[in-house]
Amino acid sequence: MRFSLSTTAAALAVSLAFAPGWAVAWEKDKTYDITILHTNDHHGHFWQNDHGEYGLAAQKTLVDDIRKQVAAAGGSLLLLSGGDINTGVPESDLQDAEPDFRGMNLVGYDAMAIGNHEFDNPLSVLRQQEKWATFPLLSANIYQKSTQQRLFKPYALFDKQGVKIAVIGLTTDDTAKIGNPEYFTDIEFRVPATEAKQVVEQLRKTEKPDIIIAATHMGHYDDGKHGSNAPGDVEMARSLPAGYLDMIVGGHSQDPVCMASENHKQADYVPGTPCAPDRQNGTWIVQAHEWGKYVGRADFKFRNGELKLVSYQLIPINLKKKVEKADGTSERIFYTQEIAQDPSMLKLLTPFEQQGKAQLDVKVGSVNGKLEGDRSKVRFEQTNLARLLLAAQMERAGADFAVMSGGGVRDSIDAGDITYKDVLKVQPFGNTLVYADMKGSEVEKYLAVVANKKVDSGAYAQFANVSLVADGKGVSNVKIQGKPLDPNKTYRLATLNFNALGGDGYPKIDTLPSYVNTGFIDAEVLKQYIEKHSPLDASQYQPKGEIVYK
């Protein structure tokens, strides 16, 4: 398949229900207009935020308008999601993302890729979500260990006016490492690129599609430099024979894939400005940031077996910028024209929002400054919010020190009142507090592993009551509670079951004789700590350079 670019491209891929058979093939010398719309990393944001940004109601209005435009021009349209529908907004989490899947039905999604956060719950919850969805959830590289069979549909087929489109779903094989090990006892995540090659070759022999799209949840890493993460879209595109994939529509890294130059994304993409997707080995690669902040739109022309991208854009969904006024005050204004909320979507989602808010808008405490939990911070440096979480865990477990993955801190808490919703946004996974007693010599070995997890990954460790120097291989100058580590003394470590079972590649400690799973949910532990110690002084939890990296 030959591609030529007029502007730029994208589409977050995944696939739809299997077609019973292909209709009449495309006609020679006839041009077919095909539009791919896409989103990814929705993470429970079915409702607009407090500033009136994004949300499925405005998304539906936009998508409906585009559908009308495309239909009027005689074209065809697919709407795809790159996965991670689950986890991030308490109103959604408490209802197992039912409002999100039902809302996606109403928007008219054709298919979605399965993301790693679809496994934040037991498989039974994901199976229920499949029932709620009127579109298929796809992944070609997730297998059941006991049967060696795929757990989900690997691809879906679409016939768009005789143009045959296959969409393959792929999930990061990091899922087994970054997800809850308790849920993966009979599940394995195989290498996506290997499975993609097999499926493409199968499709070429059997279905003979004109266009093949990989809907992936693997991440986009500039120039294929994925660090401690599993290889992503760029690496896969380079590893496959040229022409195997026409497009990769991705997610997971939660980036607007808008290239500034070859192999380098724009560092700070401004909503509403031009966006050029990546291209590797003849394959277009796209991603639409996160949370439904954008709908990606790729407009193609297909003629005589050639697919040409004529335009691409990321369309902001009511995103706003903060501007300072002459009187010293500030206001938020839209980057682009406001999109009205669809009444039918509001009617569907309002009961879910009300049910969730009734449980969540309860004040549990207050804080006099921001508690930092932004993704751009907790995966790179020690933060005061992580210290607060760990302080709560230490107090409940009677521990000497505590450790957790930075990726487990999911949001910040602003100064002012703290609600139960705020707590659940920070810790949405429902992990349990665990502890284990270890000799100082064992502690040093443990810290040597976790302290050297790479920055810019969810595994990056957050610490409390620990000071040390990490050099990439080991640790030195280790102190617990400000005192030098005694190799013969017994210390109690508090952490979460996710890490204790080997999540994020941490040493497994669940086999230690002293290991105890308290059964206390992390968010509930944090909630009770805040209630007990409010008003909180944010400065008391501020890191003071205890963790040094060489």
Swiss-Prot record:
Gene name for this UniProt entry: ushA
Annotated GO MF terms: 5'-nucleotidase activity; metal ion binding; nucleotide binding; UDP-sugar diphosphatase activity
Record function comment: Degradation of external UDP-glucose to uridine monophosphate and glucose-1-phosphate, which can then be used by the cell.
PROSITE patterns, per the entry: 5_NUCLEOTIDASE_1, 5_NUCLEOTIDASE_2
Name of protein: Protein UshA
Residues engaged in binding a divalent metal cation 2: 84, 116, 217, 252
Primary residence: periplasm
Keywords: Cobalt, Disulfide bond, Hydrolase, Metal-binding, Nucleotide-binding, Periplasm, Signal
Family named by the database record: Belongs to the 5'-nucleotidase family.
Binding site for a divalent metal cation 1: 41, 43, 84, 254
Organism name: Yersinia enterocolitica serotype O:8 / biotype 1B (strain NCTC 13174 / 8081)
GO cellular component: outer membrane-bounded periplasmic space
EC number of this enzyme: 3.6.1.45, 3.1.3.5
Cofactor(s) listed in the protein's UniProt record: Co(2+)
Residues making up the signal peptide according to the UniProt record: 1-25
Reaction catalyzed: UDP-sugar + H2O = UMP + alpha-D-aldose 1-phosphate; a ribonucleoside 5'-phosphate + H2O = a ribonucleoside + phosphate
